[in-house]
Amino acid sequence: ETRVLRPKINWKLSIDTFLESYHFSVLHKNSINPIFYRSQTFDTYGLNFRLISPRKTIGELKNSSPASLDLLPHIVGIYFLFPNSFVIWQLDHLELWEIYPSGNTPGESVAQMSFFTPEPVRSKQEEEHWEKNLDLVMHVVENEDFPLGEGIQNGFSSQAQDYLSFGTS
């Protein structure tokens, strides 16, 4: 299934929504924070990169021998494909996010999310499971991440500052 959001955010700011998990404990306190830790690893591959964040279940591996570790059930993998796409590997499904500018309006974008399951849905129970997962993802992005981004975009658009430096230390 594919769903489309049209946030009033520049497309590059929309992409920023997915670039770190440190905000989970504040912005997503009651939604996904109980599922994930707010730490992550970062690896680059040219203009592309990968983020790995641990699920809170990772503690179950504490007493496992290194040879028997199976990390995959205890992480989420976020793969950024330059310039505008993310593949998010969850425990049991994939999400493909594609983010584009919206016409000639710099303060708007289109975010398309396609949700992929390993097998076609075969029962009402499976349909309800996947719908619940999809609804959670869309709720978090549409009602938590993007409204914050829209507030930031409003600040940019207010012209309260003469200039903005981004990416310098």
Protein language model features and the residues they cover:
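C-terminal catalytic domain of Rieske-type non-heme iron oxygenases
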Residues: E1-S169
